[in-house]
């Protein structure tokens, strides 16, 4: 169906633009006293701009406060194109992952999880992680953490 193909192409373009903006934010991180400062990586959910907690976002990963579970799931869908489909990871928690199959972010896996090895330090309840991001994006690990 031509309409479905067109709508899918628009969705993919929107996703790619959103991910490209996020990538620009990660690339713009500056070193402050030896650490990457991620306090300027803002997120857009609908008409709402979410800013990271500036004092907590000094280790290279932005940490956001006061973001609802629904908003986190909406962000995951915005980045991946799919609603979370969780599977239980024994002794850890829940995890949902999607791999992008087209466009400049092809091969990038987006993971939503409610566990983290840094939970004690960050207080994060949810993490959106990006693996195998395009080579143009600086950094080994790209994560968004939510308290």
Residue ranges and their predicted role:
Residues 2-147:
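Catalytic toxin/effector domains delivered as secreted proteins or via bacterial secretion systems
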């Amino acid at each position: 169906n031509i309409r479905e193909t067109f709508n899918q192409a628009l969705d993919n373009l929107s996703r790619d633009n959103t991910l490209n903006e996020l990538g620009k934010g990660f690339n713009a991180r500056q070193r402050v006293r030896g650490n990457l400062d991620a306090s300027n990586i803002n997120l857009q959910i609908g008409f709402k701009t979410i800013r990271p907690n500036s004092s907590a976002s000094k280790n290279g990963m932005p940490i956001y406060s006061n973001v609802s579970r629904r908003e986190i799931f909406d962000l995951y869908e915005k980045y991946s194109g799919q609603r979370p489909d969780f599977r239980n990871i024994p002794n850890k928690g829940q995890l949902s992952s999607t791999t992008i199959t087209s466009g400049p972010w092809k091969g990038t896996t987006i993971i939503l999880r409610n566990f983290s090895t840094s939970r004690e330090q960050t207080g994060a309840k949810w993490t959106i992680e990006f693996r195998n991001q395009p080579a143009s994006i600086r950094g080994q690990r790209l994560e968004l953490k939510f308290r």
